[in-house]
């Protein structure tokens, strides 16, 4: 299956406060495109979020805002999108889109690797870093948006060999 793995980090608990995004495009089992950027959320940073991902207000001062980033990431979101804990990432995307309402936002299918993991392995040990360790992919910086997306892509490729991942598809519908 061709897909794009995506991960967002947020500045605070508001889903629209995206401050980083990482994407990895996989076609025929090979990475064909990548995108990684900090995003200026134009809002405050909660210290708890900074403690998780390490991104500070100073880091994003000269970063593009989400409307500029949207133009870059939109081509990645054409068919199957994969994320670990996809409800979080899809809610970030939905909230960010709701703020500026781009005319080119469209529907796409998405799949959650956390949901697949819970089905395959039960309820314990399903965090991204735990799965990475389980599959020997443990040399990554957890909560770095790009590295999380890259590891998610590798985990999804493993899951494709173990189950019918298409059974986990859901539909992303823009908020307007």
Residue ranges, per PLM feature:
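Conserved non-catalytic scaffold segment of RNase H-like nuclease domains
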Residues: 1-107, 122-143
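Short, glycine/acidic-enriched loop or turn micro-motifs at the edges of active sites
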Residues: 10-12, 115, 151
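Generic structural signal of hydrophobic/aromatic residues within well-ordered alpha-helices
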Residues: 49, 73, 116, 165-169
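Short Asp/Glu-rich motifs
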Residues: 69, 151-152
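Buried hydrophobic packing segments
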Residues: 93, 116, 152-156
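Conserved beta-strand -> loop -> alpha-helix junction used to position metal-binding or nucleic-acid-contacting
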Residues: 104-117
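Short, conserved phosphate/pyrophosphate- and ester-handling motifs at nucleotide-, phospho-/glycolipid
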Residues: 148
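Acidic two-metal-ion nuclease catalytic site recognized across multiple nuclease folds
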Residues: 153-176
């Amino acid at each position: 299956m061709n897909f794009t793995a995506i991960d967002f980090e947020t500045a605070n608990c508001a889903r629209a406060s995206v401050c980083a995004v990482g994407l990895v495009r996989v076609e025929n089992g090979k990475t064909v495109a990548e995108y990684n950027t900090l995003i200026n959320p134009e809002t405050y940073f909660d210290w708890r979020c900074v403690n998780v991902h390490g991104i500070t207000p100073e880091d994003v001062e000269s970063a593009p805002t989400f409307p500029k980033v949207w133009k870059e990431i939109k081509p990645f979101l054409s068919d199957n999108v994969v994320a670990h804990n996809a409800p979080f990432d899809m809610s970030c995307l939905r909230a960010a889109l709701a703020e500026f309402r781009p005319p080119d936002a469209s529907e796409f299918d998405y799949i959650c690797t956390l949901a697949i993991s819970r089905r395959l392995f039960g309820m314990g040990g399903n965090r991204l870093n735990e799965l990475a360790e389980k599959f020997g992919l443990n040399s990554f910086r957890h909560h770095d948006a790009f590295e999380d997306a890259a590891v998610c892509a590798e985990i999804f490729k493993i899951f494709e060999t173990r189950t019918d991942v298409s059974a986990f598809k859901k539909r992303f519908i823009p908020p307007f």
